[in-house]
């Protein structure tokens, strides 16, 4: 048996063009969370320095990302 695990990432999109536009700022790092089929907020070190955060919907992502941006901006070293 081969112990290597094949990991493939897939960019998460939407069939709804309007939703796609709203989703882009949050999910440009979506390939990181492809296996979870979730929407990504950001790359580590951008708005979420400790991790990539994923949410189940673009609406939740937008809300959480907005709060995170403000929190991280206030605490910037």
Curated annotation (Swiss-Prot):
InterPro entries the record matches: Amb_V_allergen, Amb_V_allergen_sf
Keyword annotations: Allergen, Disulfide bond, Signal
N-terminal signal peptide: 1-22
Cysteines joined through disulfide linkages: 26-61, 33-48, 40-54, 41-65
SMART domains assigned to the protein according to its UniProt record, in alphabetical order: Amb_V_allergen
Name under which the protein is recorded: Pollen allergen Amb p 5a
């Amino acid at each position: 048996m081969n112990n290597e695990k094949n990991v493939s990432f897939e960019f998460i999109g939407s069939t709804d063009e309007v939703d796609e536009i709203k989703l882009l700022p949050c999910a440009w790092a979506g390939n990181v969370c492809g296996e979870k089929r979730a929407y990504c907020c950001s790359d580590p070190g951008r708005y979420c320095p400790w991790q990539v955060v994923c949410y189940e919907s673009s609406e939740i992502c937008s809300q959480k990302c907005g709060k995170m941006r403000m929190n991280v901006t206030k605490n910037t070293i």
